[in-house]
Swiss-Prot record:
Function: Blocks Shaker potassium channels.
InterPro entries: Scorpion_toxin-like_sf, Toxin_alpha-KTx_8/9
Annotated keywords: Disulfide bond, Ion channel impairing toxin, Neurotoxin, Potassium channel impairing toxin, Secreted, Toxin, Voltage-gated potassium channel impairing toxin
Free-text note regarding domains: Has the structural arrangement of an alpha-helix connected to a beta-sheet by disulfide bonds (CSalpha/beta).
CC annotations in GO: extracellular region
An example molecular function term from Gene Ontology annotations: potassium channel regulator activity
Tissue specificity note: Expressed by the venom gland.
Pfam families according to UniProt: Toxin_6 (PF05453)
Entry protein name: Potassium channel toxin alpha-KTx 9.10
Intrachain S-S bonds: 3-19, 6-24, 10-26
Organism: Mesobuthus eupeus (Lesser Asian scorpion)
Protein localization: Secreted
Major subcellular location class: secreted
Top-level taxon of origin: Eukaryota
Length: 28
């Protein structure tokens, strides 16, 4: 998942979307 889709990708998972080197991470 790219950075642009990260917030939507992490939505509903009660996580904070972060982006490192173009990689989306959903951090609780």
């Amino acid at each position: 998942v790219g950075c642009e889709e990260c917030p939507m990708h992490c939505k509903g998972k009660n996580a904070v979307p972060t982006c490192d080197n173009g990689v989306c991470n959903c951090n609780a």
